[in-house]
């Protein structure tokens, strides 16, 4: 949502989700060069995190919300009984420097991290920025983020509202099909 109201990208996402429900076929996922780089570097970052912290990262794929089956997340790993891992491997060295100095990566991905904490029921997430181009001791920026219950409540309400909007679009399209 922007200052002036819902963003165009939100509307586009709702239409995409409605079409996926209607057709049963998922939309192709977009991946740019920076996203590909992040996916390729993630195992290195995970290994560096494990070596630095001594924590063993449990790999996990996709997690659905226990009572809202239209909500799911894919954290980069589970940590112990209460933690998550979210890794970013920025292509920009300046972004990694900012993460080292100000933990900006945790703020930039706040909603993603809070969503992961909400869906998994975990209590905290280590938000990691990793850049192997930096010298030893500066390749990892780790910032621990804890659950923000008011933010999670707002996220839950927004997801429920979005699901109702998607259902309305699907209903409208099904009505058009029956009328034809």
Indicate residue ranges for each PLM-predicted region:
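Nucleic-acid nuclease catalytic cores
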Residues: 53-75, 79-169
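Charged, low-complexity C-terminal accessory regions
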Residues: 168-180
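Charged, glycine-rich intrinsically disordered N-terminal tails and low-complexity linkers that flank
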Residues: 1-43, 103, 177-180
């Amino acid at each position: 949502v922007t200052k002036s109201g819902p963003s165009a990208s939100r509307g586009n996402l709702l239409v995409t989700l409605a079409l996926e429900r209607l057709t049963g076929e998922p939309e192709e996922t977009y991946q740019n060069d920076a996203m590909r780089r992040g996916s390729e570097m993630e195992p290195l970052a995970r290994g560096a995190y494990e070596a630095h912290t001594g924590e063993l990262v449990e790999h996990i794929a996709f997690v659905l919300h226990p009572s809202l089956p239209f909500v799911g997340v894919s954290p980069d790993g589970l940590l112990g009984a209460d933690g998550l891992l979210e890794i970013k491997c920025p292509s920009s060295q300046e972004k990694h420097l900012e993460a080292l100095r100000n933990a900006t990566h945790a703020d930039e991905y706040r909603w993603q991290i809070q969503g992961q904490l909400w869906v998994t029921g975990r209590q905290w997430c280590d938000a990691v920025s990793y850049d192997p181009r930096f010298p030893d001791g500066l390749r990892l920026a780790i910032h621990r983020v804890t659950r923000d219950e008011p933010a999670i409540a707002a996220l839950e309400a927004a997801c429920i509202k979005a699901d109702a909007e998607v259902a309305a679009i699907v209903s409208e399209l099904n009505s058009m099909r029956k009328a034809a």
